[in-house]
Amino acid sequence: PFPLPKEERAGLLMHPAWLIAWSGNFDNDPIRRGKWILEHLLAGTVPDIPITVDAVVPEDPHKTLRERLEPTEAKACWQCHQKMTPRGLPSENFDDFGRFRKREVLGENLSIFSDRHRDAKSVPVVTAGAILNSGDPTLDGEVMDAFELVHKLAGSTRVRQSFVRHAFRYWLGRNETFDDSPTLMAADRAYTENGGSMKALIAS
């Protein structure tokens, strides 16, 4: 267990359980974190990785994870990665165990016992990211850290409607159809009018 000061957390996207679930085995994974935000909060999709593409992030003990992700900015890759990676990078303030950090350790895999890499070389974490091509022009733009990302998402109508849609799919065990539009609209209205009440959403 480790402390969770309020000034270091805000919402689901900064909860250790979510951060761990969308990390790799040995490192953070901004791509997977950003893909989750795209699909679950912004109602977006990306195609499957082409079978001809080597999708492994290169290992280099002298580079940060952000630097090792630079190959995904190539034109052929960026058309999809722009929807994911910039949204996941703000969570670099947290390691793959969900712990808050200000520096990234280089040259070795992080240990759950932080004192084991106390003397290892480290660099300040860069948390800048962006929301690009979200489908909501009021949402698109640069974000400086996970807090700004979370607050922008929390105020988005698109995110709210996507949340309601995913709740519908979860509770009914199927995707929505065109005939479900009145139900979804009623659910969104009930959720909004009752201050984001899950009880009201379920009852609707």
For each predicted feature, which ranges?
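Active-site substrate-binding loop specific to GH73 endo-beta-N-acetylglucosaminidase modules
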Residues: 1-158, 164-171, 180-199, 203-204
